[in-house]
Structures are given as C-alpha cells and as structure tokens.
Amino acid sequence: MEKTFLMVKPDGVQRAFIGEIVARFEKKGFQLVGAKLMQVTPEIAGQHYAEHTEKPFFGELVDFITSGPVFAMVWQGEGVVDTARNMMGKTRPHEAAPGTIRGDFGVTVAKNIIHGSDSLESAEREIGIFFKEEELVDYSKLMNEWIY
C-alpha cells in the first residue's frame, strides 16, 4: 500500500490544527500508521530540506521548522501521495482553493500549516528521516473492505 509523509508545522501545532488535519485524512479513508509530536533538530531539518541547502531561504526554513514542535505522520492508502497534496492545497495559501487545508487555514508561504511529500520517492526518504521502521504500525482496518 502506498505511504506518504505529512507534518503539521509549528504554526499548525500552535494554532491547534492537529485534530482537524488528522480528521480530514481519516474521513477521506486513509490509514494513519505512524505519528509523533516532536521537536525537529537542526540536523533533522538539514536532512529534510537537503535540496534547498544552497538557496537563500534555507536558513529561514530551518529556523522555522525548529521553532516549535511539529506533528509528524505517516499515512497509507491508494493514491495517498497525490490525494494528500490535493487536500493540502497549493503552497501559497492565497492560491489554495477553499476547502483545502492551506486554503482554509494558511496565512503565508512560510506559515502554511502543513508539509506533505511530493512523490513516492520523497515520501520514502522523508519517512526514513522522521521514523524508524519499528515506529510504523501495520494493521488492518475493518473499513478498508468498504473503501478498497
């Protein structure tokens, strides 16, 4: 089953959106297989944002993601990577459609509530940065037979 990595960023945690976001993905029919509230270290932030190390905004990314706790999650389901991206909305909240997480709650590009993997490859890499294999729980949900 396809997996993706999602993270409620420090602004989303401080604004009490964890429950709302989890509920949206559960109601969609996706399965939460790993989750933790954590403080991102500069080392983890550097790994997570490795593709941006040479960009002028890299320092701001690291400063923000380490500024407070995040809620890291692994979700699984059919088409979860692409569907999660659609549910999050465009990166710039003012361009995100109403009904999406960023469209409903995002304020600025920097403080846009949530991060989600943009591909299966990114999901695998990001899951490996934030979770150990034994932290992910593989279980059957009775409702899956009604969804898939």
Swiss-Prot record:
Q: Which SMART domains match?
A: NDK
Disulfide bridge map = none
Phosphothreonine-modified residues are 91
What Gene3D superfamilies does the record tag this protein with?
Answer: Nucleoside diphosphate kinase-like domain
Q: From the UniProt record, list the reaction(s) this protein catalyses.
A: a 2'-deoxyribonucleoside 5'-diphosphate + ATP = a 2'-deoxyribonucleoside 5'-triphosphate + ADP; a ribonucleoside 5'-diphosphate + ATP = a ribonucleoside 5'-triphosphate + ADP
In this chain, ATP is annotated as bound at: 9, 57, 85, 91, 102, 112
Q: What is its EC number?
A: 2.7.4.6
Compartments reported by the entry = Cytoplasm
> What is its EC class?
transferase
Please give the biological process terms from Gene Ontology that the record holds.
CTP biosynthetic process; GTP biosynthetic process; UTP biosynthetic process
Q: Which Pfam families match?
A: NDK
Provide the GO MF annotations for this entry.
ATP binding; metal ion binding; nucleoside diphosphate kinase activity
What binding partners and quaternary form does the record give?
Homotetramer.
What this protein is called in its record is Nucleoside diphosphate kinase
User: What taxonomic classification does the UniProt entry list for its organism?
Assistant: Bacteria, Bacillati, Bacillota, Bacilli, Bacillales
